[in-house]
Curated annotation (Swiss-Prot):
InterPro entries: CSTF2_hinge, CSTF_C, CSTF_C_sf, Nucleotide-bd_a/b_plait_sf, RBD_domain_sf, RRM_dom. Its main location: nucleus. This is Cleavage stimulation factor subunit 2. It comes from the Eukaryota. One of its GO terms (biological process) is cellular response to nerve growth factor stimulus. Sequence repeats lie at residues 410-414, 415-419, 420-424, 425-429, 430-434, 435-439, 440-444, 445-449, 450-454, 455-459, 460-464, 465-469. Disulfide bonds: none annotated.
Length: 577
């Protein structure tokens, strides 16, 4: 025996060790080591754990420095009570403990197979999966680290090892899935791709290798293993599943942009949605006018077309795609409520004469309306409903006196561009028809009342009082020294009381320009010099006057006070109650 000990360290180690059974499950190796150190120094104490559950099996092995100490432990500690149980201490090399030595892998000659007990091929995948899942994360990481080094240093040997031990390859793949190194879908493809490899393998791994990469075993493994790897096969679908999903979404999304613009840009009212503006930018098929609109915005207020849809002859409706507000920044052009928008030279036929804004000496009643709209305006009256309160021109010049505010400050505060435009898109969009009637009647009546103080055009129909075009001939004295039709030049020289006059003249300008387009004598030379800023001022004042009480309440205190003062002064000047 001594010779065997010298020749075989494994046998010597088994002789120096004792088998300890009937160990309480809650016992720790340290506690047992303290007990067995009573008979002599303990080299190590190892508890045996179940590979499937990770729980202790209730027995272990204690190694001493020599065989005599081990024999002493068997004599003195056998039957020792610990936590209510009598420990069983026996020779570790006895025949009845061979299986325990096998499971420990101590290297004793009694171990016949390095693969453990033989299992059926059908159970191999589940057994391997459980064994891998029972490994602590640190040990699993260390295993993968060592395998990586092995593959890097000796790729051919590692390949041969994995081919000869398919259960090891399967376990490594399972570990990679558990550690989320490999997607479950990819793992399945790898397994199925290796179905023909087991034919190259022969020898003792036969019982287990069929369970490794074999196709039947693969299926059973994935069916039987309800653990994280299998669960990840659902959550990990994004690795291989995402491209089809993305393709599907792209396929579904390709027609969508083409269909949406057609639905949105078709009718004028529907084009109110801001999304229409984005679609117009994309330039989808079926909305030819939209792409044109983005490049050159016609001079028609989209709200007029939106409200009644009766202006196809003189207005391209797609302008409404970009929002209800004439000053909608998405429209790319300032379309003030007065309709006087700076023509960039791309909006009117050149033969119709230069725009009113750019040629001060031009007779401003006849041609400018045609020029601003790209064609004659047979029916300008529907535009009367344009100057709605929530659509203040946010880029107009200062209000000149009522608090010294600049409407651009209003724009900066988001008074009109956001709060009012939002209200215009929602509440005003719903009352488009009601607003039309109200603007055509109430505002027209107010316009006539206020215009009566400036002109003798009481007989002019309210329908002709559009906010576009130059002012009609001065048929009556205009108070406060304002120029007849160009009181829009009110700037800073017009008193607040008379400031309403330019507004009303602005409302009557279109009617006069259309109805009296052949009355050049009604204007003085200086009255032709109407600038876009003048019209913007008039439009801004008209918009301010049309703000509802709710809209005014939403404004900052300064702006609210200024608007209230303006309204009060206008009411006083017009004698309104």
């Amino acid at each position: 025996m001594a010779g065997l000990t010298v020749r075989d360290p494994a046998v010597d180690r088994s002789l120096r060790s004792v088998f300890v059974g009937n160990i309480p499950y809650e016992a720790t190796e340290e506690q047992l080591k303290d007990i067995f150190s009573e008979v002599g120094p303990v080299v190590s104490f190892r508890l045996v754990y179940d590979r499937e559950t990770g729980k202790p099996k209730g027995y272990g092995f204690c190694e001493y420095q020599d065989q005599e100490t081990a024999l002493s432990a068997m004599r003195n500690l056998n039957g020792r009570e610990f936590s209510g149980r009598a420990l069983r201490v026996d020779n570790a090399a006895s025949e009845k403990n061979k299986e325990e030595l096998k499971s420990l892998g101590t290297g004793a000659p009694v171990i016949e197979s390095p693969y453990g007990e033989t299992i059926s091929p059908e159970d191999a995948p589940e057994s391997i999966s459980k064994a891998v899942a029972s490994l602590p994360p640190e040990q699993m990481f260390e295993l993968m680290k060592q395998m990586k080094l092995c593959v890097q240093n000796s790729p051919q040997e590692a390949r041969n090892m994995l081919l000869q031990n398919p259960q090891l390859a399967y376990a490594l793949l399972q570990a990679q899935v558990v550690m989320r190194i490999v997607d479950p879908e990819i793992a399945l493809k790898i397994l199925h791709r290796q179905t023909n490899i087991p034919t190259l393998i022969a020898g003792n791994p036969q019982p287990v290798h069929g369970a490794g990469p074999g196709s039947g075993s693969n299926v059973s493994m994935n069916q039987q293993n309800p653990q994280a790897p299998q669960a990840q096969s659902l959550g990990g679908m994004h690795v291989n599943g995402a491209p089809p999903l993305m393709q599907a979404s792209m396929q579904g999304g390709v027609p969508a942009p083409g269909q949406m613009p057609a639905a949105v840009t078709g009718p004028g009212p529907g084009s109110l949605a801001p999304g229409g503006g984005m679609q117009a930018q994309v330039g989808m098929p079926g909305s030819g006018p939209v792409s044109m609109e983005r490049g050159q915005v016609p001079m028609q207020d989209p709200r007029a077309a939106m409200q009644r849809g009766s202006l196809p002859a003189n207005v391209p409706t797609p302008r409404g795609l970009l929002g209800d507000a004439p000053n909608d920044p998405r429209g790319g052009t300032l379309l003030s409520v007065t309709g006087e928008v700076e023509p960039r030279g791309y909006l009117g036929p050149p033969h119709q004469g230069p725009p009113m804004h750019h040629v001060p000496g031009h007779e401003s009643r006849g041609p400018p309306p045609h020029e601003l709209r790209g064609g004659p305006l047979p029916e300008p009256r529907p535009l009367m409903a344009e100057p709605r309160g929530p659509m203040l021109d946010q880029r107009g010049p200062p209000l000149d006196g009522r608090g010294g505010r600049d409407p651009r400050g209003i724009d900066a505060r988001g008074m009109e561009a956001r709060a009012m435009e939002a209200r215009g898109l929602d509440a005003r969009g719903l009352e488009a028809r009601a607003m039309e009637a109200r603007a055509m009647e109430a505002r027209a009546m107010e316009a006539r009342a206020m215009e009566a103080r400036a002109m003798e055009v009481r007989g002019m129909e309210a329908r002709g009082m559009d906010t576009r075009g130059p002012v009609p001939g001065p048929r009556g004295p205009i108070p406060s020294g304002m120029q007849g039709p160009s009181p829009i030049n009110m700037g800073a020289v017009v008193p607040q009381g008379s400031r309403q006059v330019p507004v009303m003249q602005g409302t009557g300008m279109q009617g006069a320009s259309i109805q009296g387009g052949s009355q050049p004598g009604g204007f003085s030379p200086g009255q032709n010099q109407v600038t876009p800023q003048d019209h913007e001022k008039a439009a801004l004042i008209m918009q301010v006057l049309q703000l509802t009480a709710d809209q005014i309440a939403m404004l900052p205190p300064e702006q609210r006070q200024s608007i209230l003062i303006l309204k009060e002064q206008i009411q006083k000047s017009t004698g309104a109650p």
